[in-house]
Regions:
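Active-site beta-strand/loop segments that form the cofactor-binding cradle
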Residues: 17-18, 39
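Domain-core and long-helix interface of multi-subunit machines
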Residues: 16, 22-25
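Active-site core segments that coordinate phosphate-bearing ligands/cofactors
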Residues: 1-11, 26-218
Length: 218
């Protein structure tokens, strides 16, 4: 209410806004035309829901302690359910609320599938060729190490960070090694995020993948 008064002290903005509801409280029912379009029963309850990661948590069973969701999209997010707020003194963990009445401590890396897209563009390769190259390369990518900060980085906090490749020589400069090295760099960034979560005594008994990157067989 205080914030609304600051925005416009001349009127009560509460009259201009919808009522506040919880993520799971029914606020209406599915209209027949929309139900037909979606292939769902007409009249089923509709609730406000929540943000993308909050809904991913529900969809991956991340509603109890011990489950960690790893979302592989443009950015990479790693989060877990907690019954109490998790406050990270270093500021790496976002202290989000969940949509199920608890909290959702979350780590975000800026470069996940976007790093692989940059590499695919560089080599003008499609997803099928990418998968074959990743399978053909050995672990360690022949010694090539990629720091995949193509868009800076949030975790660690390096907004002006740049992507780099190390360890190139005349023996390992093959397409499959470059691609493998990029995905290994992304993976180590996610691993670092998981370590930051578990360092706050967040248990990781089960990890569930979601997001576009989760469709990759490799």
């Amino acid at each position: 209410e205080k914030m609304l008064r600051i925005i416009d002290p001349s009127t009560d903005l509460r009259d201009r806004l919808p009522s506040i509801s919880t993520a799971v409280a029914p606020i209406g029912s599915l209209l027949p035309n929309i139900a037909h379009e979606l292939g769902l029963p007409s009249g089923i309850p509709v609730a406000p829901g929540g943000g993308d990661n909050m809904m991913s948590a529900i969809g991956t069973g991340n509603v109890i302690s011990g489950v960690v969701t790893m979302s592989l999209g443009t950015s990479g997010t790693i989060f877990s359910y907690s019954q109490t707020p998790v406050i990270d003194p270093q500021g790496n963990i976002a202290a989000f609320c969940s949509s199920t009445g608890g909290w959702l401590p979350l780590i975000c890396t800026m470069n996940c599938t976007t790093a692989m897209e940059r590499m695919r563009e560089l080599f003008d390769t499609d997803l099928g060729s990418l998968e074959r190259n990743l399978s053909a390369a050995d672990r360690g990518a022949g010694g090539i190490v990629t720091v995949p900060f193509f868009t800076g980085e949030r975790t660690p906090d390096l907004p002006n960070g740049k992507a780099c490749m190390f360890g190139l020589d005349s023996q390992n400069m093959r397409q499959e090694n470059f691609l493998r090295s990029a995905i290994e760099g992304v993976t180590f960034g996610l691993r670092n995020g998981l370590k930051l979560l578990t360092a706050q005594d967040i248990p990781a008994e089960r990890i569930v993948l979601t997001g576009g990157g989760a469709n990759s067989p490799t």
